[in-house]
Structure formats: structure tokens, C-alpha cells
Amino acid sequence: MAVITQERKIAKWKIEEVKELEQKLREYHTIIIANIEGFPADKLHDIRKKMRGMAEIKVTKNTLFGIAAKNAGLDVSKLEPYLTGPNAFIFTNKNPFEIQLFLSKFKLKRYAMPGDKADEEVVIPAGDTGMPAGPALSIFGKLKIKTKVQDGKIHVTQDTVIAKPGDPIPPDAIPILQKLGIMPVHIKLNIKVAYDNGLIIPGNQLSINLDDYKTDIMKAYQSAFGLAVEIAYPIPDVLKVSAEKAARNALSLAAEIGFITPETVQAVFSRAISKAYALASAISGKVDLGIQVPQTQQAPAQQAEKKEEKKEEEEKKGPSEEEIGGGLSSLFGG
């Protein structure tokens, strides 16, 4: 008995879709997969318009994308964990971090739905609501919104906050918010993953704090520049600082060893005078070098004790002039 097999016919649109995806995968080196579950189609259209010239956004079936990726030579196994649920595929040659930063700044809002929490302060503004007086008045009363009826319409008499950021939005307020055109819920594309030249970057690693990033870069630059100065790396900006540092070190060394040149003489003598003052301060009670050393004011009892000590010292033989001269000579590099 002959077995009759029927070849499964693939829809033409699927073939064309795979070809288009494959072409984009070869054209762009970065592919971003974003979750669009519950994301309004009109808001996705707004994002598509905003990103024109920067990236292309395509909504397609995960299976078709997987086939196209395989045909384009991508490692599909790395992407398979993210090919679940409704997705949008963003094709770009920009850095994925740049795309994430752009999307984070592109704020979108939607109307509240039951169970939503406010992403911003929700205020019912004072003025004409355009709503006819009737059953709606009881809703305003329940929400503790002060109103009045004027020309058959409900007017709110003062701005009223009905929810703060993070608070649940009262279900009774939802139709009023919609009527007034108030959208208190923020939405954004939830990026699952970025595929950049074969590198997989999970979505949670694409968000960076710019201030922290700038601080880290500045610290890295300062460390690198400090090291470059230390080793006198031969580039103009570094050599200028290295030369200044070397000059300061050389001047300090010359002053320390008493090496006199026209450039170092002031530093040498300044250092020597400082040492002379220090020595004079240490031995001023024993010998008069002709250098006035400031003395702190002492109590009368201490002054009397010092006078007695000085009298005893004067009775002893002090150092010879040759010894004193030799000490000063050593201070000045002689």
C-alpha cells in the first residue's frame, strides 16, 4: 500500500518575513529584544517615530526571528531564553547603552487601569470638568473633591490630590481621570537583552548611573595620569607635569645637601636658616648665638627657676668660638 505524504506549505508572508529579518540581522550589529506585553500599540508607534534614523523596530513572531537569526549566522542558543512572550526587536548600529539611555529619557504615559499605582502625584485640577451634573457628583463626593454645579456642569472648586507617587489609584477615580485626559501611569519598553557583535548583555546591565559613571571615569583618569607622571610617559601633557615635579625634587635635594647654584642658592640658605633657628632654639639656654628665638610667656615661679639655672650655667665654661663656628659652617654646607 503506497503512503501518500502531503508537503506542508509555508505561508508566503512568513518566507518574506524571514528574508526581511535576515537582511536586518546582517545590516545591523546590535539587536535588542524588548518585552511589549501590555504595551499600547500607539505608544510603540510613538517610539518608532522618535527612533527613526537611530534604529528600526520590528514586531514579529519569535520562531521567525529564530530562523532568520540562524540563517544570518548568529548563535541562536544565546538568544533562545529571551524568545518568549510578545517581543519587539530593535535593530541598530548604535551602542546598546546609548539606546537604553534614550529610551529611559523618552517618557510615555497611559491611562490608569484597576490595580495601578500612581507614578506621579495625581491631581484633579480646579475648573470645569465638562461632566454633566448627576450621578457623577456622588463619585466626586466619595473622593472628597469639592465641587459646585454651574451651567449644568460639574466644576471642581480647588486642586485636589487623590494619590501620591506609589499610592494605589482609587478605582472610582479612573473614569474621571480618563474624562479629564490625566495619564498617571508611566510606561517604558522593558529591554530583555542586547546582542552586540556576539556579546550578550542582559537588560538589567544596560542601565547605568551617569553621575557614578562620570566619577569612575574621572578617578580612572587621575590614577592613570598620576602613574604616567611618575614614569615620565613621553606625551606633552605628562612631560610638562613630570618636568615640574623633577625640578621641585631636584631643588629640594639641593637645599638638603647644600649644593649652591644661582637657581638653588635661595632654597639652600632658606633651609640652612631654618636649621639654624631650630638649633638655636635647642641650645639658646646654654649659649648666645645672636639669634633671637621667641619665647612663650612663663609663670613667675618658672621665670625665677630659669634665672637660677642661667646663673649656674654662666659659672660653667661654655663652648669655644671655634666649635660654634664649625657648627654653623656645617649648616651652610661648608
Curated annotation (Swiss-Prot):
Which organism's genome codes for this protein? Sulfurisphaera tokodaii (strain DSM 16993 / JCM 10545 / NBRC 100140 / 7)
Compositionally biased tracts (Basic and acidic residues): 304-320
Highest taxon listed in the record's lineage: Archaea
Pfam families on file = Ribosomal_L10, RL10P_insert
Sections of the chain in a coiled coil: none
Q: Which Gene3D superfamilies match?
A: 3.30.70.1730, 3.90.105.20, 6.10.140.760
Q: How is the quaternary structure described?
A: Part of the 50S ribosomal subunit. Forms part of the ribosomal stalk which helps the ribosome interact with GTP-bound translation factors. Forms a heptameric L10(L12)2(L12)2(L12)2 complex, where L10 forms an elongated spine to which the L12 dimers bind in a sequential fashion.
Q: Does the keyword Ribonucleoprotein apply?
A: yes
Residue stretches of biased makeup (Gly residues) = 325-334
Gene Ontology MF terms: large ribosomal subunit rRNA binding; structural constituent of ribosome
Q: Could you state one GO biological process linked to this protein?
A: cytoplasmic translation
Extract the ranges annotated as region (Disordered).
Answer: 295-334
For this record, an example GO cellular component is:
cytosolic large ribosomal subunit
Q: What biological function has been recorded for the protein in this entry? A: Forms part of the ribosomal stalk, playing a central role in the interaction of the ribosome with GTP-bound translation factors.
The UniProt keywords, alphabetically, are: Ribonucleoprotein, Ribosomal protein, RNA-binding, rRNA-binding
**Similarity annotation:** Belongs to the universal ribosomal protein uL10 family.
Q: Which InterPro entries does the record match to this protein? A: Ribosomal_protein_uL10, Ribosomal_uL10, Ribosomal_uL10-like_insert, Ribosomal_uL10-like_insert_sf, Ribosomal_uL10-like_sf, Ribosomal_uL10_arc
Q: Where are the transmembrane segments?
A: none
- The protein depicted here goes by the name Large ribosomal subunit protein uL10
